[in-house]
């Protein structure tokens, strides 16, 4: 009879085993500084909050960056820090017409940028060649024939608000990427797919323009009034000096 527990002892045992679990002894300051996240979210958050662009401007669209950097728009609030070296940049903003002579330099700058890297094509001349796409023999009809483009920003020129919208859309794209599956993703844009439909023409200044039909009348008129040629004028001047 002495081994039978009392009613009070049974109540104490039940309250200790079946009662509510006590709150963990964690301070409020520590609980407010703990964030549960994944590697993808942490990596993408760090990159989209600190995009460092390399500004590649060749024409009038690039003037909009003067207003963009100013205090009215202040693109530093997006974490954009312009860099002068492609090895320190992860965003290439191409603004203006790209010519055949500048194409190798643009491709070299893109290849020197570390991965992951992104490209924004800014302006009509960058995207399609713009007003130079019809008659110019040196303008590239779209920068996507040289390097991959992630975001197209049309306009002539685009306003600073449009550039902000493009940066926000690019940040969303960066935030949805996977750290482990990035190398498995292939480009699906028009990269090296459309060729330039150009034909070779003879140079206009070839040294024989005086033989054209439009110049023969002027040469005949000069002979009729006995105008001295260039060599005769030089000989006359030399004799006078001697």
UniProtKB/Swiss-Prot annotation:
Its EC number is 7.1.1.-. It catalyses: a plastoquinone + NADH + (n+1) H(+)(in) = a plastoquinol + NAD(+) + n H(+)(out); a plastoquinone + NADPH + (n+1) H(+)(in) = a plastoquinol + NADP(+) + n H(+)(out). Its cofactor is [4Fe-4S] cluster. Pfam families: Oxidored_q6 (PF01058). InterPro entries: NADH_UbQ_OxRdtase-like_20kDa, NADH_UQ_OxRdtase_20Kd_su. GO terms for cellular component: plasma membrane-derived thylakoid membrane; respiratory chain complex I. GO terms for biological process: aerobic respiration; electron transport coupled proton transport; photosynthesis, light reaction. One of its GO terms (molecular function) is quinone binding. Keywords: 4Fe-4S, Iron, Iron-sulfur, Membrane, Metal-binding, NAD, NADP, Plastoquinone, Quinone, Thylakoid, Translocase, Transport. [4Fe-4S] cluster binds at residues 60-61, 125, 156. It is a peripheral membrane protein. It is found in: Cellular thylakoid membrane. Binds 1 [4Fe-4S] cluster. HAMAP family: NDH1_NuoB. NDH-1 can be composed of about 15 different subunits; different subcomplexes with different compositions have been identified which probably have different functions. Belongs to the complex I 20 kDa subunit family. NDH-1 shuttles electrons from an unknown electron donor, via FMN and iron-sulfur (Fe-S) centers, to quinones in the respiratory and/or the photosynthetic chain. The immediate electron acceptor for the enzyme in this species is believed to be plastoquinone. Couples the redox reaction to proton translocation, and thus conserves the redox energy in a proton gradient. Cyanobacterial NDH-1 also plays a role in inorganic carbon-concentration. This is NAD(P)H-quinone oxidoreductase subunit K. The lineage of its organism: Bacteria, Bacillati, Cyanobacteriota, Cyanophyceae, Synechococcales.
């Amino acid at each position: 009879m002495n081994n039978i527990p009392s009613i009070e002892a049974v109540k104490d045992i039940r309250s200790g085993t079946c009662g509510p679990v006590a709150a963990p002894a964690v301070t409020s300051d520590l609980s407010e500084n703990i964030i549960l996240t994944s590697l993808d979210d942490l990596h993408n958050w760090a990159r989209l909050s600190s995009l460092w662009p390399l500004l590649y401007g060749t024409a009038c669209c690039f003037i909009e960056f003067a207003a963009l950097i100013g205090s009215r728009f202040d693109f530093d609030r997006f974490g954009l820090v312009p860099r002068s070296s492609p090895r320190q940049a992860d965003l290439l903003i191409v603004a203006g017409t790209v010519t055949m002579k500048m194409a190798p330099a643009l491709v070299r700058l893109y290849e020197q940028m570390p991965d992951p890297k992104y490209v924004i094509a800014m302006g009509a001349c960058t995207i399609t060649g713009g007003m130079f796409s019809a008659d110019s023999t040196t303008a590239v009809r779209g920068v996507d024939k040289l390097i991959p483009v992630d975001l197209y920003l049309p306009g002539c020129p685009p306003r600073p608000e449009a550039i902000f919208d493009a940066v926000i859309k690019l940040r969303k794209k960066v935030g949805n990427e996977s750290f482990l599956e990035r190398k498995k993703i292939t480009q699906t844009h028009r990269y090296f797919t459309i060729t330039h439909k150009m034909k070779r023409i003879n140079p206009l200044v070839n040294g024989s323009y005086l033989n054209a039909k439009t110049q023969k009348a002027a040469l005949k008129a000069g002979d009729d009034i006995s105008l001295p040629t260039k060599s005769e004028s030089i000989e006359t001047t030399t004799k006078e000096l001697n």
